[in-house]
Amino acid sequence: MAPRPRARPGVAVACCWLLTVVLRCCVSFNVDVKNSMTFSGPVEDMFGYTVQQYENEEGKWVLIGSPLVGQPKNRTGDVYKCPVGRGESLPCVKLDLPVNTSIPNVTEVKENMTFGSTLVTNPNGGFLACGPLYAYRCGHLHYTTGICSDVSPTFQVVNSIAPVQECSTQLDIVIVLDGSNSIYPWDSVTAFLNDLLERMDIGPKQTQVGIVQYGENVTHEFNLNKYSSTEEVLVAAKKIVQRGGRQTMTALGIDTARKEAFTEARGARRGVKKVMVIVTDGESHDNHRLKKVIQDCEDENIQRFSIAILGSYNRGNLSTEKFVEEIKSIASEPTEKHFFNVSDELALVTIVKTLGERIFALEATADQSAASFEMEMSQTGFSAHYSQDWVMLGAVGAYDWNGTVVMQKASQIIIPRNTTFNVESTKKNEPLASYLGYTVNSATASSGDVLYIAGQPRYNHTGQVIIYRMEDGNIKILQTLSGEQIGSYFGSILTTTDIDKDSNTDILLVGAPMYMGTEKEEQGKVYVYALNQTRFEYQMSLEPIKQTCCSSRQHNSCTTENKNEPCGARFGTAIAAVKDLNLDGFNDIVIGAPLEDDHGGAVYIYHGSGKTIRKEYAQRIPSGGDGKTLKFFGQSIHGEMDLNGDGLTDVTIGGLGGAALFWSRDVAVVKVTMNFEPNKVNIQKKNCHMEGKETVCINATVCFDVKLKSKEDTIYEADLQYRVTLDSLRQISRSFFSGTQERKVQRNITVRKSECTKHSFYMLDKHDFQDSVRITLDFNLTDPENGPVLDDSLPNSVHEYIPFAKDCGNKEKCISDLSLHVATTEKDLLIVRSQNDKFNVSLTVKNTKDSAYNTRTIVHYSPNLVFSGIEAIQKDSCESNHNITCKVGYPFLRRGEMVTFKILFQFNTSYLMENVTIYLSATSDSEEPPETLSDNVVNISIPVKYEVGLQFYSSASEYHISIAANETVPEVINSTEDIGNEINIFYLIRKSGSFPMPELKLSISFPNMTSNGYPVLYPTGLSSSENANCRPHIFEDPFSINSGKKMTTSTDHLKRGTILDCNTCKFATITCNLTSSDISQVNVSLILWKPTFIKSYFSSLNLTIRGELRSENASLVLSSSNQKRELAIQISKDGLPGRVPLWVILLSAFAGLLLLMLLILALWKIGFFKRPLKKKMEK
């Protein structure tokens, strides 16, 4: 298992990557994207994979790594030097560094070494270039230890750095062969020995081999130190003959090899691993000794590989179970890696490769029982970094790809042990294939301590960063930072930087380029940590702009050539700490996102500020083209030098097949001042005439000062374009420039260090003279695409204010005291009618202190009102836009002044609300103490009802019914026609007026029965319009006469001569719910029940039918004239005078006698019956 060369995109189709000037800029500051210098190389060589700016005595260069140079067979890789600033464009030159990168005394394998995939400059001169897949051969194995070349300033390889510089196959191997008679054919054993020995590097300082053969007895074929080369051992092995024997004394053979073959007398070396390979084809005859013999081997740390040949068992068709168990017991643990079985002698050659690999895997560790690699697959140089004292080399393949960091200082090399970077808090997360050393860096704390930082992006699947310190050559872990998302490759790129240039590290940036966004694309994220003492604390995270991916729904419309390529941005694939680009005194950060824009790529520039960077990027530089010929722009970045001699840091950006050098543009500092004469507007002191009117004129002096940030002492001449806007806070200006009657003027000016110009303007006759007049000047460079850029830390707009002179005596501020009084036409309840829908509010505003400038009343009102006008002040004093603002007084309301006016409203029939709500306030631009503000506000809320305009009609088909004197009552009623006359009642409701028709309830009442229960009006039918839902209290045709049911009349029900009086009749009611409609109609059919009237005594009477209408909406009411309707049906009887009842006659006679007696009594009392004249005559 080997890691990818980086968490960066791979190779695309072969094409030339020409970074022509087809770069477009989304957000621009001072990195010039239109005049870049480009370098091109073969895409298949991954030219542009790494870039570094470089300078030596010969000049300035861009170094470009091309790790696959030598395609397709010999991909050794290399570094190109590309000249900069030579006047004419010169080609890049390959340095051929791999040729001179070498380690003595090993068999080197430089194919596929990917030299140039790591490239860093040495702060003391020269640079370091690495090939992490550099390998050397040990036997038949290739160990990819990796290598780095320390290159001098003159491009000469000074020395090569590699953690392992020789084959460390220090093994003493004794092969114990079963030579008994059952082994057949012996040639197969000889072939097995030949193939196995060919794979070994045999020599006094490498592997030594001895062979022991046993059967009934044990023979030493040759000792460990007998031969000093592989060739000699191969010759000797071919001469070995089968010794034979009827017994297989396996325990004897193993024990003899332990006691004798591994002695110093026979060539065994102290401290060298002991390996025994036992080959046998049958169960031992001394197996009772095996357990002790094997334990003795264990005690002496002899690694044992056992091989069981099953040929004799298979030929004899015998069970192998017991034999296999015995041979397994001989093998070391774990058994599955140390035990082999083959079907017969001929099959021995099939296990040679696997056996050889497992034997030589023992060389990679000092652990006698281990069979894994330590530094043999380390890929040292996968990353590199120069700290203050040490060179840090990432070795991601070390310790079975757990990884490590090799530390080098001069001739001292520290290779940490496998457990060095295991911290207590993370032991529960086993670091399997963590790739520690994927990227390395260092930081300087404020205390002066140097902190070393390494990333392991596969740790616990989420990634981790380790911060440690070197103490007397030992590593002490201080802190770990963990990623948050599985597979994000957190820690695959690290960068530290000193933002404020105080020589102390301020922030650490950790890239997670495969961080998945919301749409499951590899968006990428960069985490920013601030250094506090010796600990890093999370500060913020950075993300790219949103990218659109090739989803299943839009797969056919994607422009990406290979739609199976990763989608997103991979923001954070490269992070570079660059020197101050914008000349603001703070260093900056550049981050690459090589998969943006369909793999075209882009980079983001973040400016420093204080001790960190700003979260929003200052400039984004995307790659140009269609994403097919331009790939992965931003996969490498470097920006440390001024390469064109203008004193500005330039930025080099690499992509697949090329790189571009972007020049920084100088930053122009432009300062603008504006002065005015007079500096205040006094509307009472006119000083000029404009358009035939006296007004106030003002002269403005505008001055420009310019300089360059990089050359502050040099005189700089700038061509500027500027625009002045008068009263820029107002939509309608209160001033115009003289001679143009416009509020804006635009001019060009050339400024050499400093320059001034003049403009004049005048004030218009406007009501608002409280707020100051703001004058705005906007400026820019005449040619913003070339030359310096404006300093983005300074505004390119200047605002100055001209205040108005105040009528406040000697005080600078006017302190007013406004009061508001409000009166309305109604206070308790408003009844709104169509003919009378007006509502008025009277306002009185008074000021009792200093003049109140721009005094105004603001009226907010509920939606059921519509502003219709004002009275008593000028009509243009009020503006209505959802609320009403009325200016009171001009230009101010003086002390003691009072203004009364009236606001007129109409009701809005579109909004029927239960209340009229009005909020009124009086305010001004002058100040008013909080304690006097209470009388500036009035709230009004009045209940309101709306009188619905409608027409309520009622009519009847019959108003008079006459009953003949000779009419009789039919004994049997067969139909309703036998009953009497039909009366049809009609009700009609029609909308009139502007208010909507509410839901109504119509109640129809008619006399149904006499007080004695005799029918009067008999209901036979009910019909209505569609919007009416009627519910009669009695059923139509309750006696079911129309259905054919016959009915008899009986004189027992009503005796002839009964006097009929309908004032006491019982009434029936029909209720109809009428939904809102312009017209509603209800018809009721009734029949006069003649039998009741024929048998009764009366001459004439009236039957009253009542209709009552009621609104179901509390806000919509009906006028009293539209609530009730009555219909009177007169019934008369021909030929019969009305008969007076006997009780009436008797009562009348009694009343007459009583009255006569009372009259006589009264006359008697007054002496009416006395004769005074008679008495006088008698006297």
UniProtKB/Swiss-Prot annotation:
This is Integrin alpha-1. It holds the Pfam family Integrin_A_Ig_3. The keyword Translocase does not apply. CDD domains: vWA_integrins_alpha_subunit. Residues 29-1141 are extracellular. It is found in: Membrane. Integrin alpha-1/beta-1 is a receptor for laminin and collagen. It recognizes the proline-hydroxylated sequence G-F-P-G-E-R in collagen. Involved in anchorage-dependent, negative regulation of EGF-stimulated cell growth. Ca(2+) 3 binds at residues 642, 644, 646, 650. Ca(2+) 2 binds at residues 580, 582, 584, 588. One of its GO terms (biological process) is cellular extravasation. A motif (GFFKR motif) lies at residues 1167-1171. One of its GO terms (molecular function) is collagen binding. The integrin I-domain (insert) is a VWFA domain. Integrins with I-domains do not undergo protease cleavage. Residues 1165-1179 are cytoplasmic. InterPro entries: FG-GAP, Int_alpha_beta-p, Integrin_alpha, Integrin_alpha_C_CS, Integrin_alpha_Ig-like_1, Integrin_alpha_Ig-like_2, Integrin_alpha_Ig-like_3, Integrin_alpha_N. FG-GAP repeats lie at residues 30-91, 101-160, 365-417, 422-475, 476-538, 557-615, 619-679. Residues 1-28 form the signal peptide. Glycans are attached at residues 74, 100, 105, 112, 217, 317, 341, 402, 418, 460, 532, 699, 748, 780, 840, 883, 908, 915, 939, 966, 974, 1008, 1073, 1083, 1102, 1113. Keywords: Calcium, Cell adhesion, Disulfide bond, Glycoprotein, Integrin, Magnesium, Membrane, Metal-binding, Receptor, Repeat, Signal, Transmembrane, Transmembrane helix. Residues 161-360 form the VWFA domain. It comes from the Eukaryota. Disulfide bonds join 82-92, 688-697, 703-756, 808-814, 878-886, 1030-1062, 1065-1072. Ca(2+) 1 binds at residues 498, 500, 502, 506.
